[in-house]
């Protein structure tokens, strides 16, 4: 991992809950990442999660079936339109969902907000998310980091998922890493195989350091 420097400041209960936005194209692994984060962090932190889908609450259902968190701690939002709009230009539906969840769980440490699948231009409103994690996957080809877009260049953390598929799609992970550094500069990134839990600990370390979390 191209990791951030540790912070000397720690988040306390006096600060509002940390809001972590997770975005990325359809099928990149956003829901899988959210599941793994919840399962790994739920014993140390008070967590709630909000998922976005256009016409259904499928990701909420998947997380519930997987046992990521108790059912009442996962809220599904049906955006009814462009996923990008619901997290950026008009985030009111998600801001309302955050308020509702925090009314139920006022001691929450982290609110995870998973966007619906979108393109490389998707970004979270700063009113909605304190930290943004953008997920792409190797199956899209090694060219993906070079394509740029705010998700790749401006997210707080870029996750390059499905590294195990690199030999199958002819992707060179070293090239992807080099291109990622060129596009992101000093901004951190992690290469993951989420199904095997590879890289999950690095994502958690990033959230804890940048989010000023304390246990």
Swiss-Prot record:
It is found in: Cytoplasm. GTP binds at residues 24-31. GO terms for cellular component: cytoplasm. Keywords: Chaperone, Cytoplasm, GTP-binding, Nickel insertion, Nucleotide-binding. Pfam families: cobW. GO terms for biological process: urea catabolic process. CDD domains: UreG. Gene3D superfamilies: P-loop containing nucleotide triphosphate hydrolases. The keyword GTP-binding applies. SUPFAM superfamilies: P-loop containing nucleoside triphosphate hydrolases. InterPro entries: CobW/HypB/UreG_nucleotide-bd (IPR003495), P-loop_NTPase (IPR027417), UreG (IPR004400). GO terms for molecular function: GTP binding; GTPase activity; nickel cation binding. Its main location: cytoplasm. Belongs to the SIMIBI class G3E GTPase family. UreG subfamily. Homodimer. UreD, UreF and UreG form a complex that acts as a GTP-hydrolysis-dependent molecular chaperone, activating the urease apoprotein by helping to assemble the nickel containing metallocenter of UreC. The UreE protein probably delivers the nickel. Facilitates the functional incorporation of the urease nickel metallocenter. This process requires GTP hydrolysis, probably effectuated by UreG. This is Urease accessory protein UreG. It comes from Burkholderia orbicola (strain MC0-3). The lineage of its organism: Bacteria, Pseudomonadati, Pseudomonadota, Betaproteobacteria, Burkholderiales. The gene is ureG.
């Amino acid at each position: 991992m191209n990791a951030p420097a540790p912070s000397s400041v720690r988040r306390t209960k006096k600060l509002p809950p940390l809001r972590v936005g997770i975005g990325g194209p359809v099928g990149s692994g956003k829901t899988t990442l959210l599941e793994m984060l919840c399962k790994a962090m739920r014993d140390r932190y008070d967590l709630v999660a909000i998922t976005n889908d256009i016409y259904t609450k499928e990701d909420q259902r998947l997380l519930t079936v997987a046992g990521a968190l108790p059912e009442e701690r996962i809220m599904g939002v049906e955006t009814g339109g462009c996923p990008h709009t619901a997290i950026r230009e008009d985030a009111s539906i998600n801001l309302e969902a955050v308020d509702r969840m925090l009314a139920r769980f006022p001691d929450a440490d982290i609110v995870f907000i998973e966007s619906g699948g979108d393109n490389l231009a998707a970004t979270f409103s700063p009113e909605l998310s304190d930290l943004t994690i953008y997920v792409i996957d190797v199956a899209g080809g090694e060219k993906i980091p070079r394509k740029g877009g705010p998700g790749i260049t401006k997210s707080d953390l870029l996750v390059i998922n499905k590294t195990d598929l690199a030999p199958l799609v002819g992707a060179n992970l070293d090239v992807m890493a080099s291109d990622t550094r060129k596009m992101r500069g000093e901004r951190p990134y992690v290469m993951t195989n989420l199904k095997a839990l590879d890289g999950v600990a690095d994502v958690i370390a990033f959230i804890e350091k940048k989010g000023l979390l304390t246990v």
